[in-house]
A protein has these predicted regions:
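Beta1/beta-strand and adjacent pyrophosphate-binding region of the FAD-binding site
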Residues: 1-14
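Short alpha-helical segment within the catalytic ATP-binding CA
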Residues: 17
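Glycine-rich flavin
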Residues: 2-4, 20-27, 33-163
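The conserved SAM/SAH-binding core of class I Rossmann-like methyltransferase domains
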Residues: 9, 32-33
Length: 163
């Protein structure tokens, strides 16, 4: 069991900022992520992927270059979903790499597992192959959100989905 000045639950934007800022102030910091990858919803399924898909579509369709090259200009004639997801995945993977490098550079300990409180200053982290416990003076809970799904809309993940 290690003791930290700050333990953070969640590696999304809020958790990242809390952990990095505390580390920059000389604090001993650890961060826990339930998923097998850092970044939270913003990086992996929300903001960055949706904006990357949008920008890939605009780029491949030649939308921004049409004023220069004419209305029929396209970077690629037939745009496939594979073309779009390739670019989005590249951006996502780069963001994940940046986050991991920030944690390493600032000496933030990172664990993948599910955190639960034993008491206000002690966490149990259930990992794939074991359990560990750590204590902290301060624990920040930054475990993110789930997009709303209004009951009057049929979310079938084909014609209606969320990011």
């Amino acid at each position: 069991m290690a003791h930290y000045d700050l333990l953070v639950i969640g590696t999304g934007p809020a958790g990242q900022k809390a952990a990095i800022q505390a580390a920059k102030l000389g604090k001993k910091v650890g961060i826990v992520e339930r998923k097998r990858v850092v970044g939270g919803v913003c990086t992996n399924t929300g903001t960055i992927p949706s904006k990357s898909l949008r920008e890939a579509a605009l780029y491949l369709s030649g939308f921004h270059q049409r004023s220069l090259y004419g209305a029929s200009y396209r970077v690629k004639q037939d745009i496939t979903m594979e073309d779009l997801t390739f670019r989005a995945n590249h951006v996502i993977n780069r963001e994940i790499e940046i986050i991991q490098n920030q944690m390493t550079r600032n000496n933030v300990d990172l664990w993948f597992g599910t955190a639960s409180f034993i008491d206000p200053h002690r966490l149990r982290i259930e990992r794939a192959d074991d359990l560990v416990e750590h204590t902290a003076d301060i624990v920040v809970v930054a475990c993110g959100t789930v997009p709303p799904r209004p009951s009057h809309l049929p979310f079938d993940d084909h014609s209606t989905t969320d990011t």
